[in-house]
Amino acid sequence: MNETKKSALPKVSLIMPFFNNKELVGKMIDSILANTFEDWELLAIDDGSSVETLAYLSHYTADSRVKIIKRETTPKGAQTCRNLGMDHAQGQYWMFVDSDDYLTPACIGTRVEWIEKRQDLDFMVFPSAVYINDVFEPHAPENIYGYEVHQDDLRGFARRELPFIVWSNIYRADAIRKARLTWDNRLLSLQDADFNVQAIMAGLRYDYAHVAPDYGYRIFHNTGSISNKISNPEHFRSNLYASAKFFTTYQEHFGHCYDKYIFEGVLRLYNKVFTNGINRQQAKDMIDMVKQHSRYYGTILAWQVKATMLLEHMLPKKVARQLPMVPYLLSLEKRKKTICKKIKPLA
């Protein structure tokens, strides 16, 4: 078993919230242990897992680099766990990873090598692959991140078309501390986007590494309906909060230059939330939120909702929802195809 010298601080801190799913968490830890670069610590932050899960994972702590830390603060959630992990992290560099994903054996070492060559940067972005049925697939048509294919990354985040995720990156710990970045525990969605937008707005410098994908984002094909999850009251409120926060943050830095793109992100949310028809109260809440930040785009959204509700009397709900937003949907599909063509994973 490989262990770092106890007198030395680790080069890299990996911060990983987890909640049950013991087998998948174990597989993720196994992939970290299999890395050829050895100078790291894993801070596995328990978000209230069962006794059985903790017992199953306990043997990993025989390696002194693996530390299981119990969350004792509120609220429950991955953001609280990540903030706790940041408080405990001792590494010069930080990586935020998810507990059900996969790291290639070269992942940590490659990231350290690249960022140490770029002393002018605060974080670096690396390409990812998907991980389906325990198979690493870098050529998937979607859910691929970390490629330099967007003309403007902030525009991509505003549209909810994410250029990269936090697990795509390696960060200098000092830069995060200096900028006083934290995870917003009010968010149930777009946590990664919020953190990375905060980092960019705070002036953290970054660049893309043009290397082979090193991180596997696990895809599940048997999950519940996204529209049902995103439209439940708690998640819906969180998504509205995320959009409102984007409006506020971008407008503080750029005035109204990004309003159009944040509105397109709202339309993306709208298209997912109202799959089964318009919920009048949720639609009103969405319109009110947009109008608070842009009366122009709030009025457009109000018109769109009214048009959809009229069309629902004559057409299937999906057609009624999408017909008034055809220009947006066509532009979205065009962007998706363009990005897919630009992404060419390195062997």
Report residues per predicted region.
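A conserved acidic beta->alpha catalytic loop
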Residues: 31, 38, 46-56, 75, ...
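Conserved nucleotide-sugar donor-binding catalytic segment
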Residues: 151-232
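Short, well-formed alpha-helical segments that are part of the catalytic scaffolds
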Residues: 20-34
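Glycine-rich, basic loop-to-helix element that forms the pyrophosphate-binding segment
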Residues: 72-89
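Membrane-interface aromatic/basic loop that binds lipid-linked glycans or pyrophosphate carriers
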Residues: 2, 275-347
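Short aromatic/hydrophobic "clamp" motif used to bind/position activated sugar donors
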Residues: 94
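Conserved donor NDP-sugar-binding/catalytic core segment of glycosyltransferases
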Residues: 106-139
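Catalytic core of nucleotide-sugar-dependent glycosyltransferases
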Residues: 214-223, 228-256, 277-295
